Amino acid sequence: MSAFIDTNILVRHLTGDPPDMAQRATRYLASERDLLLVDLIVAETVYVLESFYEAPRSQVAAAIRSMVAFESIVCVDPALLLRSLEVYETDRLDFAEAYLVACAETTEIGRVASFDSAIDRVDTVERVEPPRT
């Protein structure tokens, strides 16, 4: 790996904002090899694109998919990220919950402990809540 890649590089490249940094980020992504993209940075990038740039969910998902597929970028588990994006986009969960669903699906656990009833929209995992006393 040549370097871990930070959210600000991805956001500049994806948004073109501000233009000078965006050009530098895009050139860097095109010229480097084996940049490691970790899941936490993906989550933060989703948050920034949604909150600051008010990008629609479909655009955010497409942008992250393009980063996962980018030639110079390496992900620890690209299939997990892609499934997280699918759940995020189609089941309309926050990215963190979508990521938990994808983790539960790819393990033998199959359950997510959460008060967030939106997880119930995904029929591949079971949501459990802490019991009332």
Regions found by a protein language model. Name each.
Residues M1-L37, F52-Q59, P131-T133:
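Short, well-structured N-terminal submotif of metal-dependent ribonuclease cores
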Residues D6, E44, E97, D116:
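Acidic active-site catalytic centers that drive phospho-/nucleotidyl reactions
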Residues R12-L14, V48, V122:
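Residues that scaffold the ATP/ADP-binding catalytic core of kinase and kinase-like folds
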Residues V46, E50-Y53, R57-S66:
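Active-site-proximal, substrate-binding regions of enzyme catalytic domains
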Residues S72-A113:
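Active-site neighborhoods of divalent-metal-dependent phosphate/nucleic-acid chemistry enzymes
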